[in-house]
Amino acid sequence: MKIKEITEFINNGVTVEEQTCDTYKIGNEENEVKKVAVTMFATVDNIKKMKEWGADFVIVHEPTFYDHFDNKFSEDVVVKEKYKLLEEAGITIYRWHDHSHCDKPDRIFEGKIYYLGLKGDEKRTNWGGSTVLTLDEAMTASEIVKLIEDKLNVRNLRVAGELNKKTTPIL
């Protein structure tokens, strides 16, 4: 299967703005795929792990080169290292951001809710198409932070507001 066939499949039926960041960042969409890796961030460490694993196609959600539309910071030492690693490994990178958020339901939001085990009613907002979850049972910000830390193994979260106030709507 070719890389472009995979991107056509995951984008099928989803309409996005004409100016989208969902593009190939490096590599060739005509290449045949042997191993696909999916990651939120194409960090140098992640690229090294994907290279070691033998991935030839990577689907990434956030910018690879530090700008929403991946305008190149060509003199940046980290950007240079990423390019070198990706070229050496023969990895094609496709950013899958807008399609994932424009689908109904929002696939990224759905994944977060699923892995956190939260239950509630989801609604799209008028503020940039964000999705809000109104929880079935109110939780405090402290409880939500603890849940994220425990379920997603994330540390050092920052919270603005009252940590012990119960809430039902969350973004």
Regions found by a protein language model. Give the residues of each.
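Hydrophobic structural segments
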Residues: 1-171
